[in-house]
Amino acid sequence: MAVISKVTYSLYDQKEINATDIIISHVKNDDDIGTVKDGRLGAMDGALCKTCGKTELECFGHWGKVSIYKTHIVKPEFISEIIRLLNHICIHCGLLRSREPYSDDINLKELSGHALRRLKDKILSKKKSCWNSECMQPYQKITFSKKKVCFVNKLDDINVPNSLIYQKLISIHEKFWPLLEIHQYPANLFYTDYFPIPPLIIRPAISFWIDSIPKETNELTYLLGMIVKNCNLNADEQVIQKAVIEYDDIKIISNNTSSINLSYITSGKNNMIRSYIVARRKDQTARSVIGPSTSITVNEVGMPAYIRNTLTEKIFVNAFTVDKVKQLLASNQVKFYFNKRLNQLTRIRQGKFIKNKIHLLPGDWVEVAVQEYTSIIFGRQPSLHRYNVIASSIRATEGDTIKISPGIANSQNADFDGDEEWMILEQNPKAVIEQSILMYPTTLLKHDIHGAPVYGSIQDEIVAAYSLFRIQDLCLDEVLNILGKYGRKFDPKGKCKFSGKDIYTYLIGEKINYPGLLKDGEIIANDVDSNFVVAMRHLSLAGLLSDHKSNVEGINFIIKSSYVFKRYLSIYGFGVTFKDLRPNSTFTNKLEAINVEKIELIKEAYAKYLNDVRDGKIVPLSKALEADYVESMLSNLTNLNIREIEEHMRQTLIDDPDNNLLKMAKAGYKVNPTELMYILGTYGQQRIDGEPAETRVLGRVLPYYLPDSKDPEGRGYILNSLTKGLTGSQYYFSMLVARSQSTDIVCETSRTGTLARKIIKKMEDMVVDGYGQVVIGNTLIKYAANYTKILGSVCKPVDLIYPDESMTWYLEISALWNKIKQGFVYSQKQKLAKKTLAPFNFLVFVKPTTEDNAIKVKDLYDMIHNVIDDVREKYFFTVSNIDFMEYIFLTHLNPSRIRITKETAITIFEKFYEKLNYTLGGGTPIGIISAQVLSEKFTQQALSSFHTTEKSGAVKQKLGFNEFNNLTNLSKNKTEIITLVSDDISKLQSVKINFEFVCLGELNPNITLRKETDRYVVDIIVNRLYIKRAEITELVVEYMIERFISFSVIVKEWGMETFIEDEDNIRFTVYLNFVEPEELNLSKFMMVLPGAANKGKISKFKIPISDYTGYDDFNQTKKLNKMTVELMNLKELGSFDLENVNVYPGVWNTYDIFGIEAAREYLCEAMLNTYGEGFDYLYQPCDLLASLLCASYEPESVNKFKFGAASTLKRATFGDNKALLNAALHKKSEPINDNSSCHFFSKVPNIGTGYYKYFIDLGLLMRMERKLSDKISSQKIKEMEETEDF
């Protein structure tokens, strides 16, 4: 098949429709001939096509036609285009609407774009009546009536026939088409002689109901039948037009969107492009439950017999395979044989005689049952990133389930509680070769962004790793027994006694070093915990090995160590019983007694406070503050439990060092004090979205408590532990949380999946070019991919070492730090980075040496400086800043920290050049990689708990998925959260007083009303403590009341006085007369007074000012005050004195003030902050996405392709159902370069292995051959001369 490089879209013209021979003229027929189910329209349901005689796999269908007897039917999707054109011409005479007469001798093709626009404005400017002296009629506005289903004159609602519109549009001369933006003959907007009947392939038979009658057909077929029926009856134009609209897109005339029609093919979630082209059902697939197997390695997958016997693989006949194929035929293992010349597939059964069908010529193929060691793709859904779908070697296993190595369970997010996986056997040899390299677990060992191994030990293996390291005094036999099949090459080196450390040294097998962890391949750490053996840890031994050598050594370590850990467990055993957890009831009884005592004290203190408030002894706290105090007391109780458990664990470890449960805790597996607290201490406060359950009927959550009870246990504090068991009410509270979590998970899965798809579609065409830059099409996004022009999986986060006077080269390091430090103090100066990005893990090559053997200090500095200068010029073309790399080498290789030899230094920099030269290839799909990593992380996060920043009643800066979603959607005209930071609190207080919402009701006023002879008197007594607590003054309260009354339209006359009642209270007396009806208006006034007398912006949030320690540098901090406020626009801050106040606006305000680059930086940091702590490594993908969203002059949402030339097919696969229609209307021509278009046209996309074009220059080979023959002949002559001389 030829490679398609360009595609042009256009509308079918009538000649193409008329050209088909298949005439549909019947509604029903016995054998369906001449109906919309005619067998000539294509092959269906196993029946061969009656036109071409092919099967449904080979026949793409044929079009039919139905006569519409010279009626003009508008193509429904282009009704708006026809109306647009009619707005530019006179419906009476057909000439263009114009302010002044125009001549037809202008040549529009010669005009520039600017001149054409000026002519458009001049000619197409509106006027009331036609300029044509023979017409002079007023211009008519034509619209489409949904009710009448035809075009009508808007003025008098009189029908305008389609034939008249058709005549007027086709009479527009071609030379005026550019003026009206017509791209093809306007007749193509209509059906005239025949209406096309689409092939059967797009309307497979399905069961559905119409008017309570079951139909075994397709809705499209049914709708086509209605069109044929109306055409046969020679119905009116409107009737046929309505039938065509119902078939094409019923939304045009009706809001009933439930029925399926032609527009469904390109719109909605299950459109045909997505279901049949972007992804589709495949043959040779299997699905089964998964289970673990100890006998297979990370690179293998176990397949049960019933799958092996069902799936078949192809073997193509060629000179290399013909003998093997003959053997397979002879041994009766071939299931199918395909003869290419006869185009015939033969099923081979035992005892069946086959004559003259098997020729075994090149191009033929046979199908045999899948064999061991064949590469097969398998994966677990949801496939959030590429580690979910891998290609491993098939191994035969017992039982009925697919078996996987426990080492890959983490990367596939799989456990063995009934999870299922799917597998697909690719048939194309090219695909098999590609998958066996690119999707092989060894290739995928290290995470694309994080750089740590994605495979590692799980569960019991972690405990085994910990216990094995601690074991002592093993004899050689015991060591060999533990090592099993890997013990053959173990060298005792003359020793009789061995420890677990020796076993690890043998398993590592390389003279590898790492500060504080490894020395010459020996572990120097105190313990081996989970950080050394599990996946996604930077200290993983497998990761360090692969950094030192290659992924092959890393995977081998995982395979060998996993085997050894399992053997250790099977020999020495390991088990945890309830007795390990709770040897006796002493500790739990003690904890229970403490908890009961403390909760009674809390309840007592709370009850005393409530009684004192009721008796008027004290002024009550605000609701938010009261809840905070109760919560802090309950948190103290929870923390007390955790402290007691930690002390208990410490004591148990002294008394019983072999306690298996504590071994697990020390190994970093499963057990932590919080989990133990739930089991042994208290189950704690149950929360929904971070808050205790809200009270419902009668001011309570459950009927177990008194109405309006303030009992903390009545709001979801569960005192009992799981060991003691929960009471009925406690169980209901725990289930209340479970219910909200399950609904959250269901909803969030869908929302995150939708956003993930959008981000991947947005970023899929972003690749690394041959210069290590990131590009999308021809647009440059980043100068340096991954900042280092090295593959993301090779880069490594390392500790950021701050300048110190004890360092060698301190002045140089300080100067560098001052240049780069801005990037490391982030998040409104609240955070200081602890890690930075190294171009590769050079620490595994750092071998300490003595002072005598070490490289000279100046030589090392010169070497670092020269390498960085060389790299800056040759690899980064002095465009990108790589000071951070120089800083890393100067600090980590600093002679004051470590002395190294010259050879070690040379090795490190040779490796540096090697990584720069060979790791990051052109075509690396960095966009898809980044999109997948971001999506996988925010999906995991949305499914775990939601977290927020502020605890008090302030604007909660939502973290997690919700905020990420808002940032990527970039909605305009919404309030943005603005953060103000200053060391001068008074400047923030002035903003707070003006913006914070306070109403009279919040001040707990005592309001009384009395009627005097000619007026009403309202007394408002407020305790001054409430005024102080709201951080306002008595004057502000007076202003609030005064402002409300002065603006009130129901008050006729008013006056006001303020009195100091006593030292605690202040009284505002208001004198009022109301407009008629007086009684009603008085009632209204008194009803709204507590809420309507207010100040600030109406909001349910307060604006607290919090203080924090801000970083100016790694060693310079200062106290800063911060507050967040919701504003539409920064102009609202214009009247305040904000000198020396840092204002952090939202994304649109940032863009409006500082421009697109500032918006990009804001978006990047804001997106990263939504992930919370520990996800700094996501900076690169966040930066890439932010750079893409801000690639044009304005930030663009992930939902749109407004900027940049997104292809029609990309828009169509993304969900724009109008993309193909618009492309056809405007006769667009597009190159096939992007991912979506390549997918559609079976072209290899320009990413990954498809980035480079491979070809062989035969001329070069001929020249090389000539040179070689000349060289050989001259060498022979030389040899002969030497022989003669001898």
From Swiss-Prot:
Pfam short name (any one): RNA_pol_Rpb1_3
Gene Ontology biological process terms from the UniProt entry: DNA-templated transcription
Keyword Transcription: yes
Keyword Nucleotidyltransferase among UniProt keywords: yes
Gene Ontology, cellular component aspect: DNA-directed RNA polymerase complex; virion component
Compartments, as annotated in UniProt: Virion
Reactions listed under catalytic activity: RNA(n) + a ribonucleoside 5'-triphosphate = RNA(n+1) + diphosphate
Domain of life where this protein originates: Viruses
InterPro entries per record: DNA-dir_RpoC_beta_prime, RNA_pol_asu, RNA_pol_N, RNA_pol_Rpb1_1, RNA_pol_Rpb1_3, RNA_pol_Rpb1_4, RNA_pol_Rpb1_5, RNA_pol_Rpb1_clamp_domain
UniProt-recorded Gene Ontology molecular function terms: DNA binding; DNA-directed RNA polymerase activity
Listed EC numbers: 2.7.7.6
Keywords for this protein: DNA-directed RNA polymerase, Nucleotidyltransferase, Transcription, Transferase, Virion
Subunit architecture: The DNA-dependent RNA polymerase used for intermediate and late genes expression consists of eight subunits Rpo30/OPG66, Rpo7/OPG90, Rpo22/OPG103, Rpo147/OPG105, Rpo18/OPG119, Rpo19/OPG131, Rpo132/OPG151 and Rpo35/OPG156. The same holoenzyme, with the addition of the transcription-specificity factor OPG109, is used for early gene expression.
Family: Belongs to the poxviridae DNA-directed RNA polymerase 147 kDa subunit family.
Function: Part of the DNA-dependent RNA polymerase which catalyzes the transcription of viral DNA into RNA using the four ribonucleoside triphosphates as substrates. Responsible for the transcription of early, intermediate and late genes. DNA-dependent RNA polymerase associates with the early transcription factor (ETF), itself composed of OPG118 and OPG133, thereby allowing the early genes transcription. Late transcription, and probably also intermediate transcription, require newly synthesized RNA polymerase.
Protein name in UniProt: DNA-directed RNA polymerase 147 kDa polypeptide
Organism, scientific name: Vaccinia virus (strain Copenhagen) (VACV)
